[in-house]
């Protein structure tokens, strides 16, 4: 009887935990799931404004990933960021002041699947055009947003809005 009562209490507690987890929302702009289109999942990690933060975004991916990076040049080094790709990142799509600098760093580390874009929208479109079902598109730029956006929040909001409006 005691074990039956304990089991019933445990089940009710687990049901509550499951409900809370179902309603849990990630922190906005931090490895935030946005939507899925044609089997491609989109993630907003606009808060990844430096290489160390952006490494965490890459580590969180469990699918082949097309990564949008680049932005304002804060004189960061990108070696560790590129090394963290470790087979997870299949394509690096770059924007902003740092795009050439990051492309050179990627080449130095043997990562050659790099595309340079002139606009943020072009980068998103390029990722979507090159993604296949089962892939992820991750905005985790390793750079500040200045010069292209007011702040990382604006960059993240624009990303989410643009992605949600992509054609199926």
State what each model feature region is.
Residues 1-6, 10:
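Single conserved hydrophobic/aromatic residue that forms the stacking wall/gate
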